[in-house]
């Protein structure tokens, strides 16, 4: 019996060092409709393929966090990676820059992807 307890403890100790595989998120920033200056639109940031699920996503206007942002529920794909959609209403113009900033354990610093109005 004592041998079984020792073996069980060794197995548990070895398992505690295992960590889930980490996957960096793919970040896509796009508008719902083609950009037209002065015409209301939606800015989307689709973050996909990441693991673990703990993530921070911010939409930015001229480098500052946009406060009125909504998002989908956290969902997962067949491969157990996660995805989310963050979005907000905005009205594009020539001077403002928009971006999506993502913080995840796979990044040493937050990653920012700018919106390209021509995509």
From Swiss-Prot:
Coiled coil: none annotated. PROSITE patterns: IG_LIKE (PS50835), IG_MHC (PS00290). Its main location: secreted. Disulfide bonds join 45-100. One of its GO terms (cellular component) is extracellular region. Residues 25-114 form the Ig-like C1-type domain. The keyword Disulfide bond applies. It comes from the Eukaryota. The keyword Acyltransferase does not apply. InterPro entries: B2Microglobulin, Ig-like_dom, Ig-like_dom_sf, Ig-like_fold, Ig/MHC_CS, Ig_C1-set, MHC/Immunoglobulin. Keywords: Disulfide bond, Immunity, Immunoglobulin domain, MHC I, Secreted, Signal. It is found in: Secreted. GO terms for biological process: antigen processing and presentation of peptide antigen via MHC class I; immune response. Belongs to the beta-2-microglobulin family. Component of the class I major histocompatibility complex (MHC). Involved in the presentation of peptide antigens to the immune system. Heterodimer of an alpha chain and a beta chain. Beta-2-microglobulin is the beta-chain of major histocompatibility complex class I molecules. This is Beta-2-microglobulin. It comes from Leontopithecus chrysopygus (Golden-rumped lion tamarin).
